[in-house]
């Protein structure tokens, strides 16, 4: 149930209580006083409804704008971002990386990479422990377990938690990503008793908080903006306002959905095998499962709408370029 629906239900409940109990049977006052007070209460509720109505309309307008303007990185932006966050190598120093030590570089690279490649929410990233990283018995399959944790060393005031039942999930890891994570665990993340994966790298090695992660992203954003100011220029329609964990998740969702749709289209031997609607539904279900959205969440549909709009615009431009008549 949305906030709007809850507030409407609350107003209805107030009116029900008044109708049921605002009478001489339950109130020890005169009928005249009952009537006068009821008028004042009704006027009060009416004023609150009007305020709520304005708030509700404003909220809908803002939400509509956001829906049509989900900010995510283009493929070029993603490639340039990875050039910024790539950790130093023994033979090659990354002068664009804003973090000075290799330990910080690898930790922060992995955080961005997991969000960008696997669609993790920031809270899910904060829940990861060293035991979240698993391999199969024959070591040919690797997984990341997304679940709640009860680490006794978690001192964070605002503790992260799983968003919904569907957010509990097992995500298959690329073998190279598994190696990066194990390198981090064995060489960097081996200094205290806590199992939390992403912590401060200085004593007392506290688990990273929401504000700590936002500060890391702000540092990366400043380096990104310095190297590529055009990406933040709002005169360009595909610019971004800022780089945040949610922008990474938006980017992952759109890229993943587009890949799934193209994959299912290519697998369809004949156009009669699967309709476009069937292909879209399969791709949306993949996105929903991988992203940990609940069955009634409309978020996957937002990305589908954007994909359809982008595809339609591309088709129209192709049509224009192929027209026989020219101006």
Where do the PLM segments sit?
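Non-catalytic DNA-binding core/recognition domains of DNA-processing enzymes
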Residues: 1-38
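Conserved tyrosine-mediated DNA breakage-rejoining catalytic core shared by Y-recombinases
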Residues: 89, 93-97, 127-180
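Flexible interdomain linker/hinge and immediately adjacent N-terminus
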Residues: 26-91
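Basic, Lys/Arg- and aromatic-enriched nucleic-acid-binding interface segment
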Residues: 84-122
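C-terminal catalytic core of Y-nucleophile DNA break-rejoin enzymes
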Residues: 156-182, 195-221, 241-245
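Catalytic-site neighborhood detector that most strongly recognizes the C-terminal catalytic loop/helix
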Residues: 278-284, 289-318
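Short, basic (Lys/Arg/His-rich) helix/loop patches that form interaction surfaces
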Residues: 214-289, 293
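Short, charged phosphate-coordinating catalytic segments
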Residues: 20-23, 115-141
């Amino acid at each position: 149930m949305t906030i709007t629906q809850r507030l409407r239900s609350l107003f209805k409940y107030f009116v029900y209580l008044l109708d049921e109990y605002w009478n001489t049977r339950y109130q020890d006052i005169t009928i005249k006083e009952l009537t006068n007070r009821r008028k004042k209460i009704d006027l009060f509720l009416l004023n609150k409804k009007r305020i709520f109505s304005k708030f509700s309309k404003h909220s809908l307008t803002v939400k509509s704008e956001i829906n049509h303007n989900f900010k995510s990185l283009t493929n070029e932006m993603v490639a340039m971002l990875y050039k910024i966050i790539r950790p130093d190598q023994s033979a090659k120093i990354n002068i664009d990386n804003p973090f000075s030590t290799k330990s910080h570089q690898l930790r922060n690279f992995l955080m961005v990479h997991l969000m960008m490649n696997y669609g993790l929410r920031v809270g899910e990233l904060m829940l990861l422990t060293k035991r979240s990283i698993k391999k199969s018995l024959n070591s040919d399959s690797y997984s990341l377990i997304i679940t709640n944790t009860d680490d006794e060393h978690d001192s964070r005031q605002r503790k992260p938690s799983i968003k919904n039942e569907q957010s509990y999930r097992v995500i298959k890891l690329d073998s190279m990503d598994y190696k990066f994570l194990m390198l981090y665990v064995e060489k960097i993340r081996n200094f205290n008793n806590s199992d939390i994966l992403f912590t401060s790298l200085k004593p007392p090695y506290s688990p990273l908080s929401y504000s700590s992660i936002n500060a890391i992203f702000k540092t990366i954003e400043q380096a990104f903006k310095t190297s590529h100011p055009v990406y933040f220029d709002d005169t360009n329609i595909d610019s971004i306002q800022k780089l945040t964990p949610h922008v990474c998740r938006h980017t992952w969702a759109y890229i993943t959905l587009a890949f799934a749709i193209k994959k299912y289209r290519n697998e369809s031997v004949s156009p009669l095998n699967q309709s476009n609607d069937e292909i879209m539904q399969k791709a949306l279900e993949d996105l929903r499962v991988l992203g940990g959205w609940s069955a009634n969440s409309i978020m996957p549909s937002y990305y589908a709408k954007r994909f359809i709009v982008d595809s339609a615009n591309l088709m129209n431009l192709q049509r224009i370029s192929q027209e026989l008549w020219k101006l």
